[in-house]
From Swiss-Prot:
Designated name of the protein: UPF0212 protein Memar_0858
Family statement: Belongs to the UPF0212 family.
Source species: Methanoculleus marisnigri (strain ATCC 35101 / DSM 1498 / JR1)
Pfam families, sorted: DUF555
Endpoints of the signal sequence: none
C-alpha cells in the first residue's frame, strides 16, 4: 500500500485584527495550537492564489472591519492508504477532529 501527501485547504475567521499580516500570523498560531497535541505532524502554511491579471502570488487573507478571513494550507503524510480517496478521508478525519468546526477541503493528493 502506497504513502500519500494530502494537502487540505481551511478557512479561519479572526476577529479584532489590525492588519493582514497579523491575521495570517494569528490564524497559523491558532491552527498550530489546536493541532499540536493530537496532530503535530501536520504542516501549516498561509494559502496563496495566483493573480488573474499579473499572475503573481497573492495571500489568501481578507480584512474587513477588523475581521479577517484567512485561507490556510495544511499538509499531512498518510502512510499505507488503500487509495487516494482513502488517504484524503484519513487526513480530513485526523485534522477535522483536532480543528472541530473549521471547514476543510481536499486540495491535492500526491503519491509518495
Amino acid at each position: 500500500m502506497p504513502d500519500y501527501l494530502v494537502t487540505l485547504e481551511s478557512a479561519w475567521i479572526i476577529k479584532d485584527v489590525k492588519s493582514m499580516d497579523d491575521a495570517v500570523s494569528i490564524a497559523i498560531s491558532e491552527a498550530g495550537k489546536r493541532l499540536n497535541p493530537s496532530a503535530k505532524f501536520v504542516e501549516i502554511e498561509a494559502g496563496m492564489i495566483a493573480c488573474p491579471f499579473c499572475e503573481g502570488e497573492l495571500n489568501t487573507a481578507l480584512v474587513v472591519a477588523a475581521t479577517a478571513l484567512v485561507g490556510l494550507v495544511l499538509q499531512m503524510k498518510v502512510f499505507r492508504a488503500e487509495s487516494e480517496e482513502h488517504a484524503a478521508r484519513i487526513a480530513k478525519s485526523v485534522v477535522g477532529k483536532a480543528l472541530h468546526d473549521v471547514p476543510l477541503k481536499v486540495q491535492e493528493v500526491q503519491e509518495l
